[in-house]
């Protein structure tokens, strides 16, 4: 666990001035992009370690260097009976030419793949 990064989970509610969920999603996207750029501008020593797997009102994306059997223990909210989801997707990265590390763990916002997309 020495290599494990700090993980923070935030929840942002839609304000009264945002008319619908689509507008809220657009606002969250802009907030995430601005914050990512600001982190680089601020010259934070470990800026490369800042990563937002998701900032969405529709999806939760978790990042971890885990096996499938470790998910429920590491992210206990996935076992909470109050958390309702239509879908859960897990991708396990098995390094073939690099040493496993947290920064290489796959956090997919939209798609999971093996890193070799070569056809459309």
Regions found by a protein language model. Name each.
Residues 1-120:
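N-terminal segments that mediate ammonia production and transfer
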């Amino acid at each position: 666990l020495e290599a494990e990064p700090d993980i923070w989970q935030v929840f942002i509610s839609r304000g009264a001035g945002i008319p619908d969920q689509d507008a809220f999603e657009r606002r969250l996207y802009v907030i995430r992009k601005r914050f990512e750029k600001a982190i680089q501008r601020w010259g934070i020593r470990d800026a490369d370690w800042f990563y937002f797997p998701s900032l969405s009102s529709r999806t939760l994306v978790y990042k971890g260097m885990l096996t499938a059997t470790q998910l429920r223990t590491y992210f206990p909210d996935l076992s909470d009976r109050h958390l309702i989801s239509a879908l859960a997707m897990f991708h396990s990265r098995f390094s073939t030419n690099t040493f496993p590390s947290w920064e290489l763990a796959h956090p997919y916002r939209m798609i999971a793949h093996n890193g070799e997309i070569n056809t459309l």
